[in-house]
Amino acid sequence: MPKEALLYKVIDSSKRLVECTACPRRCKLLDGQYGFCGIRWNFDGKLYLVSHGLAIAVAIDPIEKKPLYHFSPGSLVFSMSTTGCSWACKFCQNWDISQRRVVAGWRLEPELAVKLAMAYGAHGMTYTYNEPIIFLEYAYDVGVEARKHGLFNTMVTNGYMTEEAIDVVVKFMDAATVDLKGHGDKEFARKFSLVYDTEPIFNALVELKRKGVFIEITDLVVPKYGDDLDKARKLARWIVENLGPETPVHFLRFHPDYQVMDLPSTPIKTLEKHIDVAINEGLRHVYIGNVPGHKFENTYCPNCGRVVIRRMGFDILNVDLTEDLRCPSCRYKINIAGRVYPTYKLERFVYIPLEAFTEFVHIKPDSLRDFVLYGKRSG
């Protein structure tokens, strides 16, 4: 349940003024105020993560859905989220979760989350659907418990995090999908996500990589506003120079949603041009996402071109690798962290009936203070 945050500092104790240090917005909050994300509240001069222990969405997914193609392929992950987000993307497909500003969710303490993950056959945890940095203290507690039982931790993040947040992330996170939009261009982010600057994302990428978190990158290619090939080239070059040519990069097809219904889906030819640009800049593992059946869902050996993992959507159809994860033709070592899980042959979407294990909690705004400080609940 609600817990005092790790990521904040007191600015003025006499005024009960605090600064949240989870994301680069660094919201400064007086008593009774909450941050942009909607779930980090100041009560009596302390910052609380009010959604700690409240998961709004939970499911067992294939890890490829994140997408993570090069980390523990074939595994099952226990996906979980809270409400809220540090961004306000106008095209968000999970807007009902990310833009919801209420304190609500299934009561899911870390021990129960891990217990359910293991009971339903998950190999790891994924913090996803909304931005995990805003509920990092909750994810951390779940992640530490998960590691006690041999489960790995991954997250899908916009990458918009502070140095203080990175220091927490690297204590328990094994892999991250960093979800760029429009090539990480700051003007695009200002227009569509209410984010002033994207530089913190690139700083975070370098630090996460340096500190041992396995990184894959997605880039949402949006027609008209976020499909410039010169910017794609600049991004690919930056990745090669700062993260390495073996970094997996996924160019995702945009579909109209939420407040952006007037744009078409990204033409497949546009995505293919992005692939060409990325390969020409030296990236060795590039993919097209949200186009099931496309040849660039597969993993190819960068040396000889052999298909070493064949995919259809989120499913793996065939794995053609040696035991030590090399191409069987030329012995090139494929950049895969962990191992390939034989569960790729199984159905990996699993519904979890949370109502059988716990209760749904919805706290009314006028009773939130008593709920956080005293555990009293009237809503």
Language-model segment annotations:
Residues 1-75:
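Flexible, acidic/Gly-rich N-terminal and inter-domain linker regions that tether
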